[in-house]
Regions:
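Catalytic beta/alpha-barrel core
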Residues: 4-8, 32-35, 56-63, 89-100, ...
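Terminal catalytic/cofactor-binding subdomain
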Residues: 2-3, 26-27, 41, 51
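Long, charge-rich C-terminal accessory regions
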Residues: 131-274
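Hydrophobic, glycine-enriched assembly/anchoring segments
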Residues: 260, 267-312
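A short acidic, amphipathic alpha-helical/loop segment
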Residues: 18-20, 42-49, 104-108, 131-133
């Protein structure tokens, strides 16, 4: 099982939608979507399109970043999920951190289920030692997602006895794109082959984005395409960077400098293709710059599909 964590921004949801049929066919990927802004009809339609392909996501009830971080926002978000029938096809995820009102959220979940809404429930245990959670607070939990399975175990039964998805964030987030120039490729994950022997159900990560959250970005001196690929029993990470990084001018030119390196690398290694790589190759052949949001979308797609294939 692979559970990528995304902030549910436009291109992130697009990436999931584009891969939905592949996820449905493999039954190995369940994305966790954490809205950072109030959902709207477009968000609902995209989730509907994902469900129509046979795929399912976890929708976070209590986001930890963005416009919905305030403690009272979770109830309005949860009601939106119910009113728009999103939990008929998708599951619910609760983030366990110091801001989580577990007592109130567990009551809301019980009331929703009592009213006839049937949905799966997963608990994502954040790295926050101030959390106090009783193992019997939530009922009908499916999985724990945690960086260490001893964390949910410490809360007692029945929560502590459930299967755990092994979470981490191996992506090397740097303040500026230029800092990736000259950075050597490295191992992104060894867990794809070892999670079962370590006693876990699956793995979870923040893809080629990292845990950190920034509400927006501006012009950059360098364009970087973050690219993962499977090599033996590990998933490796490489950063393809532009060359003309002295000014912020010509982002399209910078993109093609980085893209040419990526295409050459894929061809030299004879890497298996996927929807993300196909998207990059199409842009290269047409010499089309779609904007950096689309570049991020294709990077995410490639990573999710690489992880899907790497999970044993």
């Amino acid at each position: 099982m692979y559970m990528p964590r995304l902030r549910a921004r436009q291109h992130e949801v697009f990436a999931v939608r584009n891969c939905a049929s592949s996820f449905a066919a493999s039954s190995r990927v369940t994305p966790i979507l954490e809205p950072v802004a109030a959902p709207n009809d477009l968000f609902t339609r995209r989730l509907g399109a994902i469900a129509e392909e046979g795929a399912s996501c976890d929708l976070v009830l209590n986001p930890s970043v963005g416009d919905l971080r305030s403690k009272g926002s979770w109830r309005e978000l949860g009601d939106y999920y119910l009113e728009n029938d999103l939990l008929e096809h998708h599951g619910l995820a609760v983030l366990s951190n110091a801001d989580a009102d577990h007592a109130a959220m567990s009551r809301w979940i019980s009331e929703a289920r009592g009213a006839g809404h049937q949905f799966t429930l997963d608990i994502v245990h954040e790295l926050d030692l101030s959390v106090t959670l009783q193992g019997a607070t939530y009922h009908g939990v499916r999985w724990n997602i945690a960086e260490d399975r001893t964390v949910p175990a410490s809360y007692g039964l029945p929560l502590g006895g459930l299967l755990v998805v092994w979470a981490n964030d191996p992506f090397p987030s740097l303040p500026r794109n230029r800092e990736y120039v000259g950075r050597e490729e490295g191992i992104f994950s060894t867990r794809v082959a070892g999670y079962k022997s370590a006693g876990y159900l699956g793995v979870s990560d923040f893809l080629t984005l990292g845990r950190g959250y920034q509400p927006g970005g501006g012009p950059a001196y360098a364009v970087v395409i973050h690219f993962t690929y499977e090599s033996g029993d590990v998933v490796r990470l490489k950063h393809f960077c532009s060359e003309s990084n002295e000014t912020q001018d010509d982002p399209a030119g910078k993109f093609f400098e980085a893209l040419e390196k990526l295409i050459d690398f894929v061809d030299e290694r004879s890497l298996p293709t996927n929807l993300g790589i196909d998207g990059f190759r199409d842009l290269y052949q047409r010499q089309h710059f779609p904007g950096l949001g689309k570049v991020k979308e294709l990077s995410i797609m490639n990573h999710m599909l690489v992880m899907q294939d790497a999970i044993i």
